[in-house]
């Protein structure tokens, strides 16, 4: 009888694990805290080797062809003049298409939304997940794929083991391309654009539309603006429109209107005109604070972590989805190679902890190479 596996977290990493493990013969259920699912929340992603590997493994390599290619990289100065060009094409795949494709591979009966985990407890021969609605579920193995604010992580590393804020955050916008002013379209479209200044770094590129479309007029422009903030400044920004403090991010529509207006004004003051226009075109900007987290363990008893629940790397690496795919592969192989669950989890941890630590360190090196440590 195959072990019963409960995956807490139904985003990309949880889906990768669910598909690989269920196809390997394991009894897998996914629980996801969101009320309506996660469709439409992603932008573009740079597909690393592990992403192509999992697409090939599952037989859906066609998903890798749904993307928008930036034909060159450009670097702007404050006057909006191109000061450097690199002929390095890069394709941004559709997060939404990738998510929907993997979500469709998990039966609805095995993917339950509106299930918010409250705590995870070890049992003598497994683990037990307690949910906010009062019900509990037990499994032979619980996998925490619940992201940066992981509840499952506490069962592995303790309540005091939390990601560390690195001193800056990313403002983001995802604008239908037809709503971007022509000035910005002429300068930015079909390119991967950058502008750096002390304490500030912005980049932008086209990504597929929410439906995965790559047709002209149906794509979106994705901009990402890194800004330095003290912990006190960040705390004030992360008070959402209802006055609730969010520890890591604010989703679109949750930013207070006066802060959105301030962001547009600061963009006009500090950014090249094309980027300032792109920022102003986003009616619902959102923000993610940036954190590091690199523990020595990702397993305790019958509880294992993966993805951002296990290690949090800075987004400069563009390896978040690839890291989750690598974790899913390693976990499946360990469980197939070692019938004993404890030995399997020990093997999984031994393989993936060094990888996670290396990716976090890589993100830290990339962060030091920017101007974000200079206000």
How does the language model describe each region?
Residues 1-5, 22, 40, 46-178:
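Conserved N-terminal helical subregion
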Residues 7-23, 27-29, 143-144, 171, ...:
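Conserved mid-domain beta->alpha element of the FAD-binding
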Residues 13, 36, 149:
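Conserved Rossmann-like nucleotide-cofactor binding loop
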Residues 30-34:
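Conserved acidic E/D residue at the C-terminus of a beta-strand in Rossmann-like folds
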Residues 85-88, 94, 99, 180-278:
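Conserved FAD/dinucleotide-binding core of flavoprotein oxidoreductases
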Residues 114-119, 129-135, 268-281, 286:
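Flavin (primarily FAD) cofactor-binding/catalytic cores of flavoenzymes
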Residues 150, 170, 201-203, 310-311:
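Histidine-centered metal-chelating micro-motifs
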Residues 369-375:
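C-terminal domain-closing interface element
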């Amino acid at each position: 009888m195959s072990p019963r596996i409960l995956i807490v977290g139904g985003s990309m990493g949880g889906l990768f694990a669910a598909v690989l493990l269920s196809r390997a013969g394991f009894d897998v259920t996914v629980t996801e805290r969101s009320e309506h699912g996660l469709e439409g929340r992603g932008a573009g992603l740079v597909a690393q080797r592990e992403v192509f590997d999992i697409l090939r493994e599952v037989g859906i390599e066609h998903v890798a062809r749904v993307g928008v290619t930036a034909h060159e990289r450009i670097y702007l100065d404050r006057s909006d003049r191109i000061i450097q060009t690199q002929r390095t094409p890069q394709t941004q795949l559709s997060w939404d298409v990738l998510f929907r494709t993997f979500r469709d591979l998990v039966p609805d009966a095995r993917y339950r939304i509106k299930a918010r985990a409250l705590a995870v407890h070890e049992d003598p021969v497994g683990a037990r997940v307690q949910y906010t609605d009062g019900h509990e579920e037990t499994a032979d193995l619980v996998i925490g794929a619940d992201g940066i604010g992981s509840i499952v992580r506490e069962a592995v590393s303790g309540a005091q083991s939390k990601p560390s804020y690195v001193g800056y955050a990313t403002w983001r916008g995802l604008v239908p391309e037809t709503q971007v002013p022509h000035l910005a379209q002429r300068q930015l479209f079909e390119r991967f654009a950058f502008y750096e200044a002390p304490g500030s770094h912005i980049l932008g590129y086209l990504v597929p539309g929410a439906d995965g479309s790559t047709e002209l007029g149906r794509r979106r422009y994705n901009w990402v603006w890194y800004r330095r903030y003290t912990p006190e400044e960040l705390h004030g920004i992360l008070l959402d429109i209802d006055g609730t403090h969010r520890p890591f991010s604010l989703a679109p529509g949750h930013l207070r209107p006066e802060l959105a207006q301030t962001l547009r004004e600061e963009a006009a003051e500090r950014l090249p005109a094309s980027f300032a226009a792109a920022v102003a075109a986003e009616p619902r900007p959102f923000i993610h604070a940036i954190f590091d987290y690199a523990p020595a363990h990702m397993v305790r008893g019958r509880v294992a972590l993966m993805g951002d629940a296990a290690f949090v790397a800075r987004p400069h690496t563009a390896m978040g989805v690839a890291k989750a795919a690598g974790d899913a592969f390693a976990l499946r192989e360990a469980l197939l190679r070692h019938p004993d669950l404890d030995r399997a989890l020990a093997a999984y941890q031994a393989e993936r902890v060094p990888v996670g630590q290396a990716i976090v360190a890589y993100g830290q090196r990339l962060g030091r190479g920017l101007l974000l440590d200079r206000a």
